[in-house]
């Protein structure tokens, strides 16, 4: 029963937050692409693969979401985050492959992926180069 699960989950959250209020932080286990949704329901943290390549961009996503500046946040998401996540979703494991490739491309050490993951194809590396060019102000 969906209502039961929600009510139980809500009760559990209420039980967890009782007595700790602002000292308990919900950590969003998903990444940069979930920032708008997570922040809209009170989650104020996220795991960021983007921070490995462009920590300033990751921090800006947090700042905008925290301040409720949805117009600018949506613009950054649409222009810089969603295209990367679209590439990463092309194949299982590309979450890792793409970020390692980006690190290598900007002079950091991403290194090779471990099996069973595979490297990006050449055309996808070219696409990633375009992403990096758009990210230049954040590097």
Please give the residue ranges for each predicted region.
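Flexible C-terminal active-site loop/helix
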Residues: 108-139
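Catalytic alpha/beta core domains of metabolic enzymes, predominantly
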Residues: 1-81, 88-91
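Non-transmembrane, interaction-prone segments in cytosolic or luminal domains
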Residues: 22, 36, 45, 55-56, ...
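Residues on a specific face of well-ordered alpha-helices
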Residues: 56-59, 97, 126
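Short, structured secondary-structure boundary patches
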Residues: 66-71, 95-96, 131-136
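Conserved short secondary-structure transition element at the edge of the structured enzyme core
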Residues: 39-43, 81-115
């Amino acid at each position: 029963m969906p209502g039961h699960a929600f009510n139980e989950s809500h009760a559990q959250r209420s039980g967890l937050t009782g007595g700790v209020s602002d000292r308990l932080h919900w950590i969003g286990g998903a990444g940069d692409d979930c920032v708008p949704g997570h922040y809209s329901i009170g989650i104020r943290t996220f795991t960021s693969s983007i921070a490995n390549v462009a920590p300033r961009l990751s921090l800006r996503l947090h700042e905008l979401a925290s301040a409720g500046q949805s117009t600018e946040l949506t613009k950054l998401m649409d222009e810089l985050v969603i295209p990367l996540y679209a590439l990463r979703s092309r194949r299982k494991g590309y979450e890792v492959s793409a970020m390692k490739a980006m690190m290598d491309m900007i002079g950091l050490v991403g290194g090779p992926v471990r099996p069973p993951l595979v490297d990006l194809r050449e055309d996808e590396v070219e696409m990633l180069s375009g992403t990096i060019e758009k990210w230049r102000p954040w590097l």
